[in-house]
């Protein structure tokens, strides 16, 4: 059996906390929070990981640098990692985007910069399409506007 790679951390990652997403269930979230004496208007980053990996595997080596400038929120998307939301029903990327909006509501964030890698880029774009008032900017890495439309693609 293959063992998944361990995430690499530079410094200390943001702590985990458990939040309850109404109608969705509990979710473990990495939240760097607002440090004491920091600018309350400091931008918030939502970090969306790629397909088949976890938030820590995708972003672990970047947490220290990012949290020095931004409030960082990261979690495992549905069906990913050991902390993602679990459901018996199939999910769509739109569900992941709506999960992100629910996370923002629960933690009291009105707007954020959505940062997505691979599948996470599609989730970031869907968050912007479905909840445009919540997205103040986007950074997309190794992503696409949409994925396969037909089996031939």
Q: In which residue ranges do the predicted regions lie?
A:
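Conserved alpha/beta-hydrolase "nucleophile elbow" surrounding the catalytic nucleophile
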Residues: 49, 112, 116-118
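Conserved HGGG/HGGXW glycine-rich cap/lid loop of the alpha/beta-hydrolase fold
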Residues: 22-84
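Flexible "cap/lid" loop of the alpha/beta hydrolase fold
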Residues: 122-130, 134-153
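N-terminal cap/lid segment of alpha/beta-hydrolase-fold proteins
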Residues: 5-26
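Structural signature of beta-strand start/N-cap positions in the alpha/beta core
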Residues: 44, 71, 110-113, 134-137
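Active-site loop/turn elements of alpha/beta-hydrolase fold enzymes
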Residues: 77, 119, 143
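Conserved acidic catalytic loop of the alpha/beta-hydrolase fold
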Residues: 94-112
């Amino acid at each position: 059996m293959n063992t998944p790679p361990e995430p690499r951390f530079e410094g200390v990652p943001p702590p985990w906390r458990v939040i309850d997403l109404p109608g969705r269930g509990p979710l473990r979230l990495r939240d760097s929070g607002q440090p004491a004496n920091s600018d309350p208007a400091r931008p918030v980053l939502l970090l969306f990981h790629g397909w088949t990996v976890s938030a820590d595997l995708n972003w672990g080596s970047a947490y220290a640098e990012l949290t020095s400038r931004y409030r960082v929120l990261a979690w495992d998307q549905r069906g990913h990692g050991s902390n993602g939301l679990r459901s018996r029903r199939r999910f769509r990327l739109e569900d992941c985007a709506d999960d992100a909006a629910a996370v923002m509501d629960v933690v009291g964030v009105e707007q954020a910069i959505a940062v997505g890698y691979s599948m996470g880029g599609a989730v970031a774009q869907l968050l912007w399409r479905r909840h445009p008032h919540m997205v103040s900017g986007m950074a997309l890495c190794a992503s696409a506007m949409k994925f396969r439309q037909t089996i031939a693609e």
